[in-house]
Amino acid sequence: MSSGKILTLDPNEVGQVGMYKLLIGGVLPRPIAFVSTISSEGVTNLAPFSFFNAVSSNPPCLSVSITRKNDGSKKDTLRNIEATHQFVVNSSPAWLAEKLNACSAEFPHGVSEFEKVGLTPAESARVRPPRVAECPLAFECELYETVEIGDGSQGSSTLVIGKIVAVQVDESAIRDGKLLIDQLEPLSRLGGLSYGLTREIFDLPRPSANSPSR
């Protein structure tokens, strides 16, 4: 519903922190990429990112936008991707909400979130970084392209586009080539500290240009 009164906000006046709050509170719901990587020294890393989406099916690609830390430095996920050119986007099922959230803490460099939160690294099919064994779906990716957004200060990000080279899926979560949402139980990110669940689903027929509008 609308009050009829519209406010115009200038990003320059709102500022970086204010715009971040508007983005996470207005772009809803956001799917969560539970990204696993590995450093050149062999240390695994696991972190959730909600600036994430599908890009293309030919070639099959996903995108994850990785913001800088508050001091402007790069996160371990980005450092690992730049070093190895590989990563895995694991699904974010509701039953892993607590562990997923725990992985968002800023652990010291060289510490594996797999070990800290008690998740199981499983061997991937075509990339070196492990997938999360507890997740029913994983997209194994090789780096396709990175795009720097901003000047590298707080709020800047690197848009990472990954080409999917393999998909790992629990057989209970797929039927006739279609993924089953009730088996995936996807978690989504909302504004502030809030998360969401996909509980109510409805279908609409795909319209044609000749079908009457209602």
Where in the sequence are the language-model features?
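Basic, polyanion-binding surface patches
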Residues: M1-R214
